[in-house]
Amino acid sequence: MANYDVLKVDGTKAGSIELNDNVFGIEPNQHVLFEAINLQRASMRQGTHAVKNRSAVSGGGRKPWKQKGTGRARQGTIRAPQWRGGGIVFGPTPRSYSYKMPKKMRRLALRSALSAKVQENAFTVLESLTFDAPKTKEFKNMTTTLELPKKVLFVVEAEDVNVALSARNIPGVTVITTTGLNVLDIVHANQVVMTKGAVEKVEEVLG
């Protein structure tokens, strides 16, 4: 287990914590990370695309000309696919793009993403993160004091309305709870900041 500094919101050291190597110290599995990101992105798709086939296009109920005697090719409707304004063949229909991944793979992906951030020195542990009231300015000052990059993911152990409201209007800052921890947010962030309580909760689940 590796020792990691625990910081206060003013940047001073509050102590240290031993990170579980099974969660924060494994060799990142790039393939599983790739699969987990694909799964998340697929689940985000709306899937509301739709086109009209020959039965859905308005009109075309009358046969355009008689079957025989005209010398022309036989036609049953002006909404057949070969006609201008006709229906679409095998077009997209509304569907869900989401699919499932085994639980062990999902957890391995989370451990891989967290371990990668630790290896990149893009991981910070805070003693706690609380506000008496929504204070965007204080939150912004904290990110400056801690010298955090533009894209930061804050992970807290439980939902805190004041923290969420304080960070909501700051570009590039995302606040989630441990239950909402996901690979896409971790990978997209330049820095992951977790509270000590959040680290303990994550280790309890993934360790």
From Swiss-Prot:
Q: Which domain of life is it from?
A: Bacteria
Instruction: Spell out the molecular function terms from Gene Ontology.
Output: rRNA binding; structural constituent of ribosome
Q: Does the keyword rRNA-binding apply?
A: yes
A Pfam family of the record is: Ribosomal_L4
Q: Which GO terms describe its cellular component?
A: ribonucleoprotein complex; ribosome
Q: Where is this region: Disordered?
A: 50-76
Assigned keywords, A-Z: Ribonucleoprotein, Ribosomal protein, RNA-binding, rRNA-binding
- GO:BP terms for this protein? translation
Please describe the quaternary structure of this protein. Answer: Part of the 50S ribosomal subunit.
Q: Which NCBIfam families does the UniProt entry name for this protein?
A: rplD_bact
HAMAP family tied to this protein: Ribosomal_uL4_B (MF_01328_B)
User: Family assignment?
Assistant: Belongs to the universal ribosomal protein uL4 family.
Task: Write out the function statement from the record.
Answer: One of the primary rRNA binding proteins, this protein initially binds near the 5'-end of the 23S rRNA. It is important during the early stages of 50S assembly. It makes multiple contacts with different domains of the 23S rRNA in the assembled 50S subunit and ribosome. Forms part of the polypeptide exit tunnel.
What is this protein identified as?
A: Large ribosomal subunit protein uL4
Which organism is the protein's source? Macrococcus caseolyticus (strain JCSC5402)
The gene name reads: rplD
